[in-house]
């Protein structure tokens, strides 16, 4: 297991060469928290290395959901009938959304510590990671404003032009469309922003092509942290919770 290998990309080619020599599978696991600079890799690794994008923990993985309903079963058997009851209350779900699926938050010893993980993550992204990803100097305040715009528009089909106006209107922030897209691209490479692509069960339907992506993050707790919400305030804003959950 080699963690954060993207900080030393030569590891990729070294692993590829070693795999060719041994002619065995399942020998190495390379993990990283952001996208590697592909120009530093000599070979794609096709046929030797498979890529898998992972996310934060689901309620089933954190052992909070009873897992009695399977999405796969619902698709495989549309006529299936079931009578199950969630063990989680609305307050439990609100807290889970505010806390997020971060392993450090799930395993935290107190609720206060659990809720601080997402806030710390956002601060690190805005103050450090946004520049470390490719060495380009970026404005931490502008980064935060762009993320806040995403948070306000989470789970909606908000257009880029709409969010750009939102950013510019905040604190007289100056931002052009190319600059906005540069920041968004960097945040996507950091796996912070993860929009949900259009989906339609009718594969050949034009609706799939015409529908835009819904705005989203790798974890709902990021939106909560950016909007300055708490489990208590979220209980008074169930409509907002619906978009976040």
Where are these regions (language model features)?
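Conserved P-loop NTPase "ATPase switch" module shared by AAA+ and STAND
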Residues: 1-11
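Structural recognition of the conserved hydrophobic beta-strand(s) that form the central parallel beta-sheet
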Residues: 2, 26-33, 53, 62
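Conserved RecA-like P-loop NTPase ATPase core
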Residues: 3, 15, 62, 100, ...
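Conserved catalytic/switch belt of AAA+ P-loop NTPases
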Residues: 12-36
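Residue-level signal for well-ordered alpha-helical positions
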Residues: 14, 44, 65, 228-229
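Glycine-rich, phosphate-binding/catalytic loops in enzymes
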Residues: 16-19, 45-49, 233-234
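Interdomain motor-coupling "hinge/lid" segment immediately C-terminal to the ATP-binding subdomain
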Residues: 39-152, 156
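Accessory nucleic acid-recognition modules appended to NTPase machines
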Residues: 110-245
């Amino acid at each position: 297991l080699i963690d954060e290998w993207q900080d030393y990309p030569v590891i990729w080619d070294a692993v590829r060469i070693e795999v060719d020599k041994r002619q065995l599978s399942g020998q190495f696991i390379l993990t990283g928290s952001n996208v590697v600079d592909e120009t530093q890799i000599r070979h794609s690794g096709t046929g030797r290395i498979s890529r898998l994008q992972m996310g934060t923990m689901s309620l089933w993985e954190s052992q909070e959901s009873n897992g009695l309903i399977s999405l796969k079963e619902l698709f495989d058997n549309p006529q299936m009938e079931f009578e199950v009851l969630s063990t989680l209350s609305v307050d439990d779900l609100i807290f889970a959304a505010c806390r997020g699926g971060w392993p450090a938050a799930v395993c935290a010893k107190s609720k206060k510590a659990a809720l601080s993980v997402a806030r710390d993550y956002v601060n690190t992204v805005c103050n450090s990671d946004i520049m470390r990803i490719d060495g380009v100097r970026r404005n931490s305040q502008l980064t935060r404003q762009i993320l806040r715009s995403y948070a306000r528009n989470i789970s909606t089909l908000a257009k880029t032009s709409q969010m750009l106006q939102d950013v510019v209107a905040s604190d007289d922030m100056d931002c052009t469309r190319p600059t906005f897209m540069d920041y968004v691209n960097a945040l996507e490479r950091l796996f912070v922003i993860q929009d949900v692509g259009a989906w339609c069960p009718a594969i050949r339907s034009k609706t799939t092509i015409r529908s835009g992506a819904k705005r989203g993050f790798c974890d709902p707790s990021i939106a909560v942290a950016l909007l300055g919400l708490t489990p208590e305030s979220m209980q008074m804003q169930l409509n907002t919770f619906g978009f976040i959950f």
